């Protein structure tokens, strides 16, 4: 039985990857921070009683900023594969916590590589390093491939740049089977709530259910290459099954503006959103509702509030400059030719399928809150 160690197992990618590897017969070890004690909802369905003798999912406390902890954990687990997915990955927040991001995302990767080397596991353990399309930042060519020069535009991206090159360095210097997956934006129903796609699907769901009047966005013209996380974790697995380690761009090759993502997400539940104005004065309005689709996917009881919003021409989407980054990344679109040719990887979800999956999940999630509110219970404040 193969043994895998996943850092960041409580995150979106870690949860999907853990489930995928368990189905393949792996013994999966996951590293989680103490602060993630109450943040295990993504893997709760995989939980196994720690008193069982033959369980194949084991969780360990750990942190990428603690080299002794990492070394001890790798020595104890003796993994065949390490998937380093843990990171402080919110770009906007990285400008506020640059030192921590450098320590965790940059030096944390070095700590894993050095632990494997010092423990004499170079021949045994293969390492996957989660790199990011944010490395390209101020893009030097379109689309971006493995050969495109990097130009990071945030503390997060700079930290990941160090992690990328130290992985390459250890591969070349010590003959490690260590590879980078340069993953472009990948989303899902369990995406972090403050990431732009999930922010949109959550807010639109609440608007449709009459629980929220409007929501605020940053740069609506930013373009991203969005795929489904379920597809992307399969690429991670395939990368470590190759005889020769290398670096791969994982992307769909299609880019979409945030504005168009909002329009597509609204359309999924029968709403037409039109944008008027430019820059910080740009606003989005619901102008039409397809009653058949809305009733099917949201519910007839919520229709009257949407019709009222259309009649009043109330804005639903507004721009708030506080969500702009100090240095913007305007266009990301990946060239997945290498991963498709060598790995045989091809995404199963297109953007429409991704949006459908996310909207269906968030409508279901917030209907629960709507029922609680109607029953007189207090619900969480989701405004940002």
Regions found by a protein language model. Give the residues of each.
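Conserved C-terminal active-site "lid" loop/helix of NAD(P)H-dependent oxidoreductases
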Residues: 43, 229, 288-344, 364-365
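NAD(P)-dependent short-chain dehydrogenase/reductase
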Residues: 42, 139-143, 153-155, 161, ...
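Residue-level preference for the first positions of well-ordered beta-strands
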Residues: 3, 214, 245-247
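Flexible, low-complexity inter-domain linkers and amphipathic docking helices that mediate domain-domain
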Residues: 278-282, 289, 295, 310, ...
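Non-catalytic, hydrophobic alpha-helical segments
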Residues: 232, 236, 250, 261, ...
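Short aromatic/basic micro-patch
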Residues: 37, 226, 255, 318, ...
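N-terminal Rossmann-like NAD(P)+-binding domain of SDR-like oxidoreductases, especially those catalyzing
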Residues: 1-188, 230, 236, 240, ...
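Solvent-exposed beta-strand sheet faces enriched in polar/charged residues
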Residues: 216-218, 249-251, 318-320
